[in-house]
Curated annotation (Swiss-Prot):
Belongs to the conotoxin M superfamily. This is Conotoxin Mr3.5. One of its GO terms (molecular function) is toxin activity. The modification Cysteine amide is found at residue 63. Disulfide bonds join 49-58, 50-62, 54-63. Residues 1-19 form the signal peptide. It is found in: Secreted. InterPro entries: Conotoxin (IPR004214). Expressed by the venom duct. GO terms for cellular component: extracellular region. Residues 20-46 form a propeptide.
């Protein structure tokens, strides 16, 4: 039984589990996550607009 433990220890030292590629490391996943993050980081053109009914200071983008 101790031989199996020694063999397992040697194998884990030579080939650690962190060397295996994970699903999150795939380039396609990273590109999709980056694209999704860019979509959410765009400003909303309606944010900060005045409430309805529009006052004279409103822009046509918000009120029109």
């Amino acid at each position: 039984m101790s031989k199996l433990g020694v063999l397992l220890t040697i194998c884990l030292l030579l080939f650690p589990l962190t060397a295996l590629p994970l699903d999150g490391d795939q380039p396609a996943d990273q590109r999709a996550e980056r694209t999704q993050a860019e979509k959410h980081s765009l400003p909303d053109p309606r944010m900060g607009c005045c409430p309805f009914p529009c006052k004279t200071s409103c822009t046509t983008l918000c009120c029109g």
